[in-house]
Regions:
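Membrane-proximal transmembrane or re-entrant/amphipathic helices at the cytosolic face
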Residues: 192-193, 216-277
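Interfacial transmembrane-helix starts/ends
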Residues: 30, 62-91, 108-111, 199, ...
Length: 277
């Protein structure tokens, strides 16, 4: 039941794109999906081992430890999600341009919607693990509702805005059910407390990403002269530069402001005794 939402997304999207746009656009969208799906699969595989032990953690009954681990995973996922969409946004169109040609490049609006969907799925991929750990399976209506919202919005918006409208179905359905309902349900039935602190921290992560990205834009506009569209060598060089600049800004801000990220980083590098968490 809980896989239905994702199944509908992957099976229905190409059909709806073909119906409201064209078969050619299905292929164009598929080029972007290949790159992004591989990235998402890699990231999810990195967390498989960590999130597999959540059930045992919950069984111990130490609520402080449970929430500490929850926020560590949460912060790292939001960090990775932010980093991934930043790099894809700045690199995917130049890559497609060099790989296939200018005619295969999707509009900036479509790319933003695709990346918004990617960000939501990477950053919120852990909630299900905690819900399963608590044995909270009885919101069986959720995946069915997600699938229904997805299809309805995709049909309505697709008939108006084409590809962008179809993709909005994925974003809005996932946002409402997985990003809003699931955390609320977890706090309500799992942690047995109000979810106010959760939303405060999520807004904090979003603000950190926004400020970091804006800071990079200022640097890019005034100091970076490399064009990623010239050849693969320039693309790689540009990728290295922006990864370093944004990585430093984003990492420092997450470490300074995000308690969960700071806790994970200190534990990962074994520097807890030198850093106040």
């Amino acid at each position: 039941m809980h896989k239905i939402g994702g199944l509908v997304q992957y099976q229905a999207a190409p059909i709806l794109i073909y119906s409201f746009v064209s078969l050619k656009m299905v292929a164009y969208y598929g080029n972007y999906s290949i790159v992004i799906d591989k990235v998402q699969t890699l990231i999810n595989s990195l967390f498989t081992g960590i999130e597999a032990g959540i059930g045992n953690l919950i069984a111990e009954g130490n609520q402080i430890k449970i929430e500490k681990v929850f926020w560590e995973i949460n912060s790292v996922r939001y960090y990775i999600a932010g980093f991934v969409i930043f790099l894809i946004y700045h690199l995917v169109n130049p890559f497609v341009f060099l790989w296939l040609g200018e005619e295969y490049i999707l509009s900036n609006t479509v790319v933003v919607i695709i990346l918004l969907n990617t960000y939501l799925r990477i950053s919120n991929g852990y909630n299900a693990s905690f819900l399963f750990g608590y044995g909270l399976f009885y919101d069986t209506w959720a995946p069915l509702t997600e699938a229904a919202i997805n299809i309805v919005i995709a049909i309505v918006c697709g008939s108006i805005w084409g590809l962008s409208g179809v993709l909005l179905g994925n974003v809005i359905s996932f946002l409402l059910i997985v990003c809003i309902w699931k955390p609320f349900f977890l706090y309500w039935k799992g942690f047995k407390k109000r979810s106010t602190s959760y939303w405060f921290n999520i807004l904090k992560y979003l603000a950190i990403l926004a400020v970091s990205w804006y800071s990079f834009i200022l640097i890019d506009k005034n100091f970076i002269t490399v064009s990623p569209n010239q050849n693969y060598k320039s693309l790689i060089f540009y990728a290295v530069i922006i990864t370093f600049i944004f990585g430093v800004i984003f990492s420092l801000m997450m470490f300074a402001v995000g308690k969960g990220f700071r806790s994970f980083t200190c534990r990962f590098f074994k520097i807890e005794k030198w850093i106040k968490i």
